[in-house]
Design a protein with these regions (language model features):
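Perimembrane loop-to-helix junctions flanking transmembrane segments
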Residues: 26-44
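Juxtamembrane "helix-exit" motif on the non-cytosolic side of transmembrane helices
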Residues: 96-105
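Aromatic-anchored segments of alpha-helical transmembrane domains
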Residues: 8-16, 88-97, 148-154
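Alpha-helical transmembrane segments in multipass membrane proteins, preferentially the mid-helix core
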Residues: 121-137
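Interfacial helix-start motif at the membrane-water boundary
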Residues: 38-56
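Interfacial segments of alpha-helical transmembrane regions
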Residues: 72-87, 136-147
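Non-cytosolic membrane-interface motifs at loop->transmembrane helix junctions
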Residues: 76-79, 104-116, 139-141
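Alpha-helical transmembrane segments of multi-pass membrane proteins
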Residues: 7-29
Length: 154
């Protein structure tokens, strides 16, 4: 859990200097225009990205599991864990199948891209399958978990 928590945290943290140095990527034909120029506004907008959100959810829940001897029992924790796992898998699939191909022109950008769009979407579900306590995804928790990505999409 330590590694599967630390890597998405590093990915989220390295997003901020990328936002300071690069304009928003606005992909043609996706239905929106504008974006943020490089600088504080783009850096502070990083948490609005689905990639950032999904990696932050995985980081927070993985580090919580790593810090505790026994797994949390609350519906809220396991709903957030489930939302993070599902969201980071969606991030990996959508980015690599649809959005990949944009130029990553710095080492930090390439590192961040690989971490958040390839490594974490594979590592998080693998760690979940190997180490998470069984029986934590219930219909109630799955329903609660769906609220997070739906709120992001709204």
């Amino acid at each position: 859990w330590q590694v599967s928590g630390a890597l998405p945290l590093i990915g989220c943290l390295t997003s901020f200097p990328i936002g300071m140095s690069k304009d928003s990527m606005v992909i043609p034909g996706v239905g929106y225009q504008g974006g943020f120029p490089a600088g504080w506004s783009h850096a502070l907008n990083q948490p609005a990205y689905f990639t950032w959100l999904s990696n932050a959810l995985v980081a927070g829940t993985s580090l919580t599991l790593a810090a505790r001897r026994e797994g949390p029992t609350s519906d809220l924790f396991w709903a957030v864990r489930t939302a993070g796992l599902g969201s980071v898998m969606v991030t990996g699939i959508v980015y690599n199948a649809v959005l990949r191909g944009r130029e990553q022109d710095t080492f930090l950008y390439r590192f961040n891209d690989a971490l958040q769009h390839i490594v974490n979407p594979v590592l998080a579900p693998a760690v979940w399958a190997l180490f998470d306590p069984r029986g934590q995804i219930t219909p109630r928790r799955a329903g609660l978990a769906s609220v997070i990505p739906l709120m992001w999409a709204a």
